Structure formats: structure tokens, C-alpha cells
């Protein structure tokens, strides 16, 4: 699935280098933003940025893409590759899961730090999603989007790669609705960044960054940013086709693409040291963000010792006197299974 990884490279680069609050050295940092690649089939979109940013992947890992035992399986897998927040692949599931992530963040914020001004709490973070046409076609994403709008999850930002191509070529054979209007009806904040707005295709990362900044400031509604792209651009003969969605470029097209972007078509897997030095400055940026967050967190912990103790217990997976919390059915002669299950779940 090279097409989306090629045309969304500037979008993913922008997220990792300029937007996401992450620490490459600590993928479990409590204060991190969460990134979910709902378009999990385009796993290279994320893997390349994890390599460039020094987040645990190296060039040999990219060479081992989609091979048994590698850190770069065909779809991102949670618990297998650092900085992958959740396993994705089934279309639409990533948007639905991200809604749950955003809901959980708001619950966490309300539990531990409800009175601090927005943006000032160590428990403030955003959930960012990259999704494609296939994700937006699925019913599960529609249901989740409806819930996210109803719950006013302003910490959720979805970047929708609207390239209008699927593995069956143009999506107009099955998908022609006004997605922006649909999400507006769900109660979302909707913006559009069109890379093809002018006569010449321009990867308008500045416009996209402005849209993301506006989404971050929209605290009462989830945000959808419709990014209109050409899949596989600037691949000379396969861009904007279903072939580049799910099939390898092939040696001839790859050589043409490298030539088009000023690379040596005879070289493979070459990343100039100065490029890596630049992108891996993400590590220093992450440490700076982490240091600033640590100060906020330490101040919160000093002012809220009981809440800090609760946080430590929850992070440690400790449930005090669990058996005493569970309902006792020893004297019950008859009860519907669903009722007993409900009592047990509610107690937990």
C-alpha cells in the first residue's frame, strides 16, 4: 500500500515534527498526545516517521517491512512496535477507537484535575487520527463520530485523506456523499485544506498547520480536517489510480518517481546524514516538552496528594478488596444472566 504513504508523507511529517507532544525516549509517557493511524493498511505512513524521528525504528526495520517477526508488520500492532497506540486495520475501527481514547482522556482529566484551566493541566492532551475514504465509508466510524459530536470531544482531531481512490479505483462507484456536511451535522468542527486548490498541486503544509492549530483551539467540538490529496503524488504514471493504492510501484515506476523528486534512481534506502540529524531533533523537542510537563505534574502531585495516590494505584492495576466490591449471588434463586452480569460490571 504505497500510495497513501507517499502522498501523505508531508502530513505525517508535520504531525510528528511540529504537532504531536511525544517523547521518542518514552512511548508510555502519561502526558503524550495519542496518534492513531485508522488507515492501518498504510502502515508506512507511520513507520517512516518513527524512523526519521528516532522513535525506535531504524533503516533495517523499514527494509523488513511486512516480514515475519519484524517491527514493521503490514498493519501497526500495539505492544509490538513502540509508539503504536492501538492495532489498526479494519476500516473505520481507528476512528471509533480514537473516540474512546478521547472520551477516556476527558474522564481522566475530570477525575484527577477538574478545576485547572483548559490547556494548563498535565492531563490535557489531544488524540490525532489519520483516516481515509475507506474509513469514512464504514458504519462504525459514523456511529463513533455521532457519539463524539454529541459528547463534544474537543480533544479529538481527525485528518481525513480525501483522495477519492480505493483499491477499486475512483470511489464514486459507491461513495459520493458530502462528508464535510455529514460531520457538521454530527456537531463537528470541519475545515478543508485542498492541496489541489490552485492550478498546480501544492502540498500546503502551512495551511494544514493553521487548520490543526484552529482545531486545537476548538475545545467544545471534535474536529475533522478534510485534506484533499492526490494519492501517490508525485508518482509520474500511477498517481491517482487504484493500482498505487494497494500494489507495489515496480522498479520502473520507482525509478521515475526518484528522478521526479531529484533522487538518484540507482540508490536504494539512502537517507543523507544531515536529513536524519534534522528529523531526529524530535528527540530534543520531546525532552523539552517532557521537562515542561514534569514541572506541571510535580506541582499537581504536591497539591493533590490523594489524587496522586489514586493515580499511582490505577497505573499499578491495584484494586483494593476487590471481592468485597463484587455482588453476592449466594442467596439468589433466580436472576437473568444479563442482570447479574450488569451488577458485576457496574461494581467493577
Where are these regions (language model features)?
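Glycine-rich ThDP/TPP pyrophosphate-binding loop and its adjacent helix/strand module
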Residues: 22-26, 32, 80, 84-281
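Thiamine diphosphate
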Residues: 1-127, 192, 276-348
